[in-house]
Amino acid sequence: MAIWQGASRRLSTGAKVWRAAKKHKREMGRPAAETQVSDRIKRKIVRCRGANLKVKLEKTNYANVFDQANKVCKKVAVTKVLDNKANKHYIRRNVMTKGAIIETEMGKAKVTSRPGQDGVVNAVLLTE
């Protein structure tokens, strides 16, 4: 069944709201990519509204980490997810989202990109 992102048919009181218009295709959604740390890279290209393309990163083991002290960016390996405010279960499953704290070869880093939307993991090195 499709994911629908329109308004609910119920009010906060529980009363039923009668719809003035039917459901439209533009209100449909898709399941989240949930980018995982893996030993291989897997991307999925999806057609979006207006014939645009969106690259969803499903699995990866690399991130572009920016070191603010030295003003240098490096492609480094990601070992695991340390913290994720989006969902506490994402830590155990090694799912990266924007704002997640990951462990890399350079040290701890915070993800600044949206891997499920951008197709790449960009992060900023955290100073300890």
UniProtKB/Swiss-Prot annotation:
Keywords: Ribonucleoprotein, Ribosomal protein. Coiled coil: none annotated. GO terms for molecular function: structural constituent of ribosome. PROSITE patterns: RIBOSOMAL_S8E. GO terms for cellular component: ribonucleoprotein complex; ribosome. One of its GO terms (biological process) is translation. It comes from the Archaea. CDD domains: Ribosomal_S8e. Pfam families: Ribosomal_S8e. The keyword Transcription regulation does not apply. Part of the 30S ribosomal subunit. HAMAP family: Ribosomal_eS8 (MF_00029). Belongs to the eukaryotic ribosomal protein eS8 family. This is Small ribosomal subunit protein eS8.
